[in-house]
C-alpha cells in the first residue's frame, strides 16, 4: 500500500509503523477489555461504542480534536502516523462491517442473549480478520511492539 501513497507520506508511515498500527487498532481497544468475547464490561464497551458512533453521537469529532491537538505537540510525525492508522480503521470498518454484520447476526437484537452472542461473534470475526491480514503482511502481533507505545505524553 505504501507504494500508492505520496512518497513523503509513505516514508513517514514506514518510519512510524508502530504508531500507524497502534492507531489502526485504537478504536477497538476497549472491546478487548474483557475476560472473553462473551463477557464485555459495560464501562469499557461504551467507550468503543461511542468511538464508533453507535450511541447516536458524531463519531468524527474526536478525530478533529486529535488533528487540532497534533498541531500543538512535539513529534507531529508520530501523531500523524497514529491518526492515519486510526482513519484506516474507520475505512476498513466502512468496507467490512456490512459483511461482518451479515455473518454474525443482529448486533442490536432485542433479545439480550442473542445480542450478546451476535456481538461476541462480531468481535471474534473481526479479530480473526485482523490476525489474517497481519499474517498476510508477514508480521506477528508480538512483533508490532504496540505495548511500548502506551506512554501518553503529558502535553497530550
Please state what every model-predicted region is.
Residues 1-81, 94, 99-148:
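N-terminal, motif-rich segments that launch catalysis or mediate targeting to/interaction with membranes
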Residues 3, 85, 152-156:
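Short, intrinsically disordered, charge-balanced linker/junction segments flanking boundaries
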Residues 80-88:
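Short, glycine/charge-rich beta-strand/loop segments that flank catalytic centers
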Residues 87, 91-95:
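Active-site His/Glu-centered metal-binding helix of metallohydrolases
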